[in-house]
Amino acid sequence: MHLVSVIQRGVWAVLLWPNLLASSVPLDCREEQGILSRCPSISQEKLLDRVIEHAELIYRVSEESCSLYEDMFIPLQFQRNQVGYACITKTLPVPSSKNEIQQISDKWLLHSVLMLVQSWIEPLVYLQTSLDRYNAAPEMLLNKTKWVSEKLISLEQGVVVLIKKMLDEGMLTINHSEQGLLQNGVQPQMLESVMRDYTLLSCFKKDAHKMEAFLKLLKCRQTDRYNCS
């Protein structure tokens, strides 16, 4: 029965995947020369809408990737226990409680999104490399993680331009680090690698949801500041 469920989910994913790609609005802010010059020509309101749409799609695909990974590699008894691995963004100064989120400024909402986005760029590259070593990783999972990784860079570019438009500020940079993912270049054992990759997928899904929620709150504040929750 479990195998049938996995196959059915895979069939639906194959059928819906092209539609998901076709429905996304491009958020490519970068010209060939590496200069952010496309998004600045978009109005602030439209740019925020596109950034939100990107965040929504990234969260949706991260959810699908995590579920697919669970079905393929993680026994039920381990799905709520990630073997003590902490999320890599745990130490970031990002609001977590509802009260904190409601009290922070628009500026800090945007910078929180950017910190989360930038903190995940390199770990997702690592995740792709790790999944490539699996003998049984389905192509759909590999394609989804690659798509999310690419869209995350587009989201970063959009948020950077949004910060400049809304706050008249330059880019906030985060020092990307893979420390704790591959320490001293030593490859983890397969079981450890599977659980570590599962933690990465689960943590990214949570952070992708935060990015989406922060951006939607920001959008709400632009129209009805006193009735946003």
From Swiss-Prot:
Gene Ontology annotations of biological process type: animal organ development; growth hormone receptor signaling pathway; positive regulation of growth; positive regulation of receptor signaling pathway via JAK-STAT; response to nutrient levels
UniProt key word Thylakoid: no
GO MF, one example: growth hormone receptor binding
CDD domains, alphabetized: somatolactin (cd10286)
Signal peptide start and end residues: 1-24
Glycosylation sites: 143, 175
Keyword Signal found: yes
Keywords assigned: Disulfide bond, Glycoprotein, Hormone, Secreted, Signal
Coiled coil: none
PROSITE patterns in UniProt: SOMATOTROPIN_1 (PS00266), SOMATOTROPIN_2 (PS00338)
Pfam families the UniProt entry points to: Hormone_1
InterPro entries per the UniProt record, alphabetical: 4_helix_cytokine-like_core, Somatotropin/Prolactin, Somatotropin_CS
Subcellular location: Secreted
Primary localization: secreted
GO CC terms: extracellular space
Intrachain S-S bonds: 29-39, 87-203, 220-228
Family (UniProt): Belongs to the somatotropin/prolactin family.
Protein name per Swiss-Prot or TrEMBL: Somatolactin
Organism of derivation: Cyclopterus lumpus (Lumpsucker)
Lineage summary: Eukaryota, Metazoa, Chordata, Craniata, Vertebrata
